[in-house]
Swiss-Prot record:
Residues 1107-1135 are annotated as: Disordered. Its main location: host cell. GO terms for cellular component: host cell membrane; membrane. The keyword Transmembrane helix applies. Residues 1110-1135 have a biased composition (Low complexity). This is Putative transmembrane protein ORF1334.
């Protein structure tokens, strides 16, 4: 077997970039026996008998050896079925949870197309969608200075930079960036700058070299390069020695009295350095052309720099030409489209030409689609001679200077009534197809503009209808634009300035599933809220979403922020349930469907097939519309199979109704919002929650047929709370093949439609299943696209009246009338002896009541009704200055009161607690920071440091507050738990491993995985995380199983028909677990993440890492596998050491795998070029496909004395197996001036390990005789080694019995072949010696 056993970093002044791995080969030999004494025994036999036997043995060997050698891997069939199963937090005794689908598709890796939600309960059918407005997906940072007093934080969707009194100037936050061309633009939009730009300080946009890291400040620190373009007109260069040099002062300072946009264009000059080409301030261009000494090749990070006495708010920061807002866009904008207050600002003023556009990829799935835009403001007005509007482009449009360029097709429907066709020839081919086809909307007010496009009989596009504020204008204009050439849908500007709050394409209703048709103003989005305006409508209007309950209870919640019209007497706005056949009616008083209305004014109505009947009036009070209110209705299924209106909650006050209705539970098809003709109200939150067994991905809700085309999927780990419709960007039906997943039992899920993939890259949703209230499966990890990405697990108390929810990018925590002591907590285990927990609260309407604050819990907290239950540990640091400890007996003990002042809730505040480990191994509360003011406490507590399992926000009775940021940090990079958006930077990167599985073969990273154990390591630069994955392919025929274990500890037993694991694990299999493997039992703990900054973690200079508590074997409280499969895998047999993952296989064969902090060759800008893997067939090197590789990697294999064995090159994406030789060897891989050496040597395997390995693949009745034959052959050889006349018999035993099984247990065939050849030579020598003596 092979094993990676150690990791060393050998650096010297001569070779500072060489990182060395050591790979060891375990072969069977005797360490103490001199080579001259290693002879196989043979017995005295007559010459002719020996010769006959030898001939027979030689013939049999020719047949037997090829049979026992594994065959070459066959080609891969990409159309085979595929399934996944996941390990749960509790022992599992039922059948495994299986998602039975075909090959899963490639997932668009942009984080904007995946939504993750982390709160209890799952609501409704989940729609796949694509966000046309992807915005900028923020991560908190890649590198960041460490001298901030208040770290940058999110508030109202803006990143706040606060440097009022930092101990050092020059604080920065920067994101990883490597330009792909010789020009790029950096744009920042600053909405507010209360402090003004204070001179002589220098905030601005900065670029840094890859070596910057997390410095205390960028002033006076050495070892990196920087280039700073300040907001006050200066350009500075930072040398590696730490000195800043001023290069120029060339443009004015923008006024901070108003919001401003600041863009810098950087270009590469002929010397290979950076030129600051142009600065744009609010679209005014200032030509700079300042050449700098900063090498273009050294651009590694782009960031924002703050300085002393500067406070400003950033709503937008992006680098282009990398895609950041759109799919394609024109290139002659003076001001690129940007986000401001939740709207896309289209500013074409000052452009060098009209026809500036921004467009998104779209391919229609039917012969009709609608494009809708809602414009909230148009300061410039629509000029008669211009042509802004909605435009369709062919797929080859790309990024042109303007929409009139040549080489593509376009169809423009302008806002001022004109329709234009653009042929291939560009301007000369633009034809006005129709003028004044409809009136121009007034720009004095917001307006909605919708165009319906249809495919005509000639296969071209017809502009069918234009709607302006819901007024239809029939056009029916046939155009020459081919329907098959629709590739992009976009917005075109012509020297205009306007603000867009909504833009979407829909092949079916675009905001909802069904809605009434007599609106005067269709519902639209404004400032993140759905505006429900029924004024002027001819009847009661509704908007409803497809929903079918899986359980027998559902909760429907709406949060109304404003109700200007009030609820007039006689009106009945409210929450309404519809039957599946409701469709798009003029209003809900028509006949032919069922509905149930729970009105805000206390009335309950039932709509039979012929109309409404009042079932109950004044069932509960009417909420006051003078203030925002939350309204929740709980519906249950009664014994008659009908709907019961169980409870209504108004602002968390419960009103028990238990009112039975005639509406059949089985007829629930849509859930919606209803308004009467005089109503106007604003909705910020609307959702349906329930306990589900699994989840659903829905296709077309009308025809129940799958879409075709590009696949996008919304993936939701369980349990979640899904705010289905509150989205600042539009939710659009995907052009995709999607399955409708239905639940057939609590542990079995099947899909109605297959998902076909043309790629071997996979996406595996993270899924959970529930039986009653008992979680069977909950795995907080998701393999997306090519690799494994961690998702933070969470626990939450269960007595909330209003569960925590998101509103305007903030987490709303409301315990106004709930049971006290509620919490929401995230899994966290510290890897050092210090951690900081920070919360930023933007608003606290209730004031601080009782004991809300930051708390830490032991790992066994789980989902309790409240945190004064028993059985776990807790430590609470309240906002009001008190510190409490909770022992396992449920008693809270106050450790300190009034330890620090209570922050004022009249303003937003930041609250940080520093926890440290004291000499007793317990937690000390070291310091509390309130708005950057430090209060030293040093309060020792009885809470053991090793018991930190969750970090939480605790809420007490009568508290309501809004959280925009919550994070944990142990160094310079915070681990953000609550943030306005969350990007999975690892998804789709070249650092993940692609894998493929069919019934006979498993490929990982283009390498065939043999039966038995294999090890792969990966590195995620953006998250500073090492991913090490163990893969075990089951020995049962036709049932391959991969076990992905990211944790640095695993105890592993190989069984004849399955396996037993005690580890973090994810099971991937074609058929779930092997059918013959009954009573599976797994122990699950959340993944351990190894940080990469600080004094006790990996650095690029080889500092050792001490494994944290999360990397040690599970404690005695963790469930263990059944005794039949765990007898040889106890934690006592495992010893841990720094930098090492340890595996116990069959009790005594140890596999040691180093935690590779940078498991591959890297370029100067940090791009990883290759990785290593090892398994029972050998050592493999895999070259990544990355833009950083421009030439092949050079590989040299040589003996340790320097003699070259082989030299060759490998292209990106190739995997090669290292050829093994007799003796030690080095594999040297180089790229440019960077080199990695991988030495390979031979070690020994002990006899006990061999016996255990043999026993794992044979029944005991055969394994024992085999072991005795193996041992006996060497015993006989030792006893009669001096009698050469009795040659051959020991060799015959070895060839016939021992060699085949050495191959079976994983000894490389090349090694076994060598010993077989040696044995044959000994037989021949024996025969010759016998003849000579005779």
């Amino acid at each position: 077997m092979f094993s990676l056993i150690s990791l060393s970093h050998e650096e010297s002044a001569e070779s500072a970039n060489k990182y060395v791995w050591r790979v060891s080969l375990w072969v069977e030999s005797e360490r103490q026996t001199p080579p001259s004494e290693v002879f196989l025994p043979f017995f005295r036999v007559e010459y002719m008998k020996v010769r006959k036997v030898s001939i027979v043995v030689l013939v049999l060997t020719l047949f037997i050896i090829p049979v026992i050698i594994p065959p070459a891997h066959s080609s891969i069939n990409t159309s085979t079925t595929y399934a996944t199963a996941y390990v749960g937090e509790t022992s599992i005794s039922s059948e495994p949870f299986i998602l039975d689908v075909a090959n899963l598709p490639w997932l668009n890796p942009q984080g904007s197309n995946i939504r993750f939600f982390e709160y209890s309960n799952l609501t409704g059918q989940l729609y796949a969608y694509e966000q046309l407005f992807s915005k900028t997906t923020w991560t908190v940072n890649t590198v960041e200075s460490t001298g901030w007093e208040t770290l940058p934080y999110w508030q109202n969707g803006q990143l706040v930079f606060n440097c009022p009194s930092a101990p050092h100037g020059g604080q920065y936050i920067a994101w990883r960036y490597t330009p792909s061309s010789n020009t790029f633009n950096v744009t920042i939009h600053i909405t507010s700058w209360p402090s003004g730009i204070n001179n002589p300080y220098s905030p601005g946009i900065a670029i840094y070299s890859p070596t910057v890291g997390d410095q205390p400040t960028d002033i006076g620190t050495s070892g990196f390069l920087a280039l700073l373009v300040t907001f006050n007109g200066q350009i500075w260069y930072h040398e590696t020695n730490g000195n800043w040099v001023e290069l120029s002062v060339v443009y004015p300072t923008p006024s901070t009295a108003y919001p401003f946009t600041f863009t810098v264009t950087f270009t590469e000059n002929s010397a290979g350095n950076v030129t600051v080409s142009t600065v744009y301030i609010n679209s005014t261009a200032y030509t700079v052309n300042v050449n700098t000494p900063f090498p273009w090749s050294q651009i590694g990070y782009v960031g924002i720099r703050g300085d002393i006495d500067n406070l400003f708010y950033v709503s937008y920061f992006a680098v282009s030409p990398s895609p950041f807002v759109n799919s394609v866009e024109s290139t002659d904008w003076k001001t690129l489209p940007y986000w401001q207050n939740g709207e896309l600002v289209i500013n074409g003023t000052g452009a060098s030409a009209g026809g500036q556009y921004i467009a998104w990829r779209f391919t229609p799935s039917s012969n009709t689609f609608n494009v809708t835009i809602h414009i909230t403001s148009w300061p410039s007005g629509i000029s008669g001679g211009t042509y802004p509007g909605i435009e369709i482009f062919s797929p080859n449009v790309g990024n042109q200077p303007y929409a009139q360029a040549s080489g593509f097709l376009a169809l423009l429907v302008t806002f001022n009534g004109n329709i234009w066709y653009h042929g291939i020839s560009g301007i000369s081919g633009c034809d006005l197809l129709k003028s004044s086809a409809y009136p121009t909307p007034s720009t004095a007010y917001p307006f909605t503009f919708t165009v319906t496009f249809t495919e005509n009989s000639a296969g071209n596009v017809t502009v069918s209808t234009v709607y302006i504020n819901s007024t239809a204008h029939t056009v029916n204009l046939n155009t020459p634009f081919p329907w098959s050439q629709i590739g992009y849908i976009g917005i075109t500007s012509c020297y205009d300035l306007f603000y867009v709050s909504y833009f979407a394409v829909s092949p079916s209703p675009f905001v909802n599933s069904v809605e009434s048709t007599d609106w005067k103003t269709l519902p639209y989005w404004q400032n993140g809220q759905l505006v429900f305006n029924v004024t002027g409508a001819s009847g009661s209007q509704y908007i409803a979403w497809r929903y079918t309950p899986v359980g027998n209870t559902i909760n429907v919640t709406i949060h109304i922020t404003s109700f200007p019209s009030g609820i007039p007497s006689g009106d009945n706005p409210g929450i309404e349930i519809f039957s599946p056949n409701v469709g798009d009616q003029p209003y809900d008083e028509v006949s032919g469907f069922l509905s149930l209305l729970v009105a805000f004014n206390g009335n309950i109505w039932y709509h039979g097939l012929n109309g409404f009947v009042l079932l109950k009036s004044s069932a509960f009070p009417t909420p006051s519309t003078a203030y925002p209110f939350t309204f929740t209705v709980t519906f249950t299924e009664n014994s008659a199979g009908n709907v019961t209106v169980s409870t209504v909650y108004i602002n968390s006050t419960a009103y028990t109704l238990n009112f039975n209705t005639p509406f059949p539970w089985s007829q629930i098809g849509y859930i919606g919002i209803r308004g009467d003709p005089s109503n106007l109200f604003y909705v910020s939150y609307f959702s349906t929650t329930q306990q589900l067994y699994a989840y659903e991905l829905v296709t077309n809700p009308y025809t129940n047929t799958p879409y075709t085309g590009t696949v996008y999927m919304a993936i939701f780990p369980y349990p979640i709370s899904y705010d289905v419709y509150v989205s600042q960007a539009p939710i659009v039906y995907s052009q995709a093949t999607l399955p409708l997943v239905t639940v057939s039992s609590p542990s079995q899920v099947t899909t109605q439609y297959p998902i076909i993939s043309t790629s071997t890259y996979m996406v595996i949703p993270s899924i959970g299943a529930y039986s009653g209230n008992t979680p069977l499966f909950l795995y907080p990890q998701m393999a997306v696209s090519e690799g494994i990405v961690p998702v933070i697990p969470m626990v939450e108390s269960t007595s909330w009246k209003t569960l925590p929810y998101w509103q305007n990018g903030q987490l709303v925590l409301d315990v106004a009338a709930a049971c006290s002591s509620q919490y929401v907590a995230w899994r966290y285990t510290p890897s050092s002896n210090t951690m900081n927990v920070t919360i930023h609260i933007t608003s606290y309407p209730s004031g601080i009541q009782y004991n809300p604050g930051i708390s830490i819990y032991s790992p066994n907290i789980g989902d309790q009704p409240y945190d004064y239950a028993s059985g776990f540990l807790a430590l609470l640091v309240t906002f009001s200055g008190n510190i409490w400890y909770h022992g396992t007996n449920a008693n809270w003990v106050e450790l300190r009161s009034s330890a620090y002042p209570t922050p004022s809730t009249a303003y937003p505040f930041t609250f940080t607690v520093t926890f440290t480990e004291n000499s007793a191994g317990n937690v000390t509360i070291s310091t509390v920071y309130i708005n950057s003011t430090a209060y030293t406490l040093n309060v020792n507590t009885p809470f053991p440091w090793s018991q930190i399992g969750y970090v939480a926000i605790r809420v007490d009775t009568q508290n309501l507050f809004y959280v925009s940021y919550f994070s944990i940090s142990q160094g310079s990079s915070p681990f953000v738990l609550v943030s306005p958006s969350y990007a999975q930077g690892f998804v789709g990167s070249q650092y993940a491993y692609p894998y493929f599985m069919n019934t006979t073969t498993v490929l990982v990273n283009n390498t065939a995985v043999p039966k038995g154990l294999s090890v792969f390591s990966g590195y995620m630069p953006g998250a500073n995380t090492v991913f090490s994955t163990f893969l075990y392919m089951n020995t049962t025929p036709q049932s391959p199983v991969l076990v992905l274990m990211p944790a640095p500890y695993v105890s592993f037993n190989a069984l004849s028909n399955g396996f037993s694991i005690t580890a973090d694990a994810q099971i991937l299999s074609l058929y779930g677990y092997p059918a013959t493997y009954t009573n599976p039992s797994f122990t699950y703990t959340p993944p351990g993440i190894i940080g990469m900054s600080g004094t006790n973690t990996f650095t690029f200079k080889g500092a050792q890492t001490q494994l944290s508590a999360s990397t040690t074997p599970p404690s005695s409280t963790t469930p263990t596998p059944p005794s039949s499969s765990s007898s040889s895998s106890s934690s006592s047999s495992i010893s841990t050491s720094p930098n090492t993952i340890q595996v116990v296989l069959n009790g005594s064969v140890y596999v040691h795998v180093p935690l590779l902090f940078h498991p591959a060759l890297s370029t100067p800008n940090g791009s990883v070029l290759f990785s290593t893997s090892v398994n029972s067939t050998g050592v493999y090197i895999s070259s990544y496909v990355t833009s950083a590789i421009t030439t092949p990697l050079n590989v040299t294999i040589e003996y340790t004395n320097g003699t070259v064995i082989k030299s060759f090159t490998i292209e990106p994406g190739q995997t090669f197996q290292v050829p093994l030789v007799n003796g030690d060897e080095n594999v040297i891989i180089s790229y440019g001036n960077h080199t990695v050496t991988i030495p390979i040597s031979a070690n020994n395997v002990n006899v006990l390990s061999l016996r255990n390995a043999i026993s794992a693949v044979l029944p005991p009745i055969y394994a024992l005789p085999l072991f005795l034959l193996f041992a006996g052959s060497f015993f006989i050889s030792l006893a009669v080694r001096s009698v050469p006349k009795f040659a051959g018999m020991g060799s015959i035993i070895y060839i016939f019995f021992v060699a085949p099984f050495l191959i079976v247990i994983g000894i490389p065939t090349s090694v076994v072949y060598g010993t077989v050849v040696g044995a044959l030579i000994i037989i021949i020598i024996g025969l010759w010696a016998s003849r000579s003596q005779d």
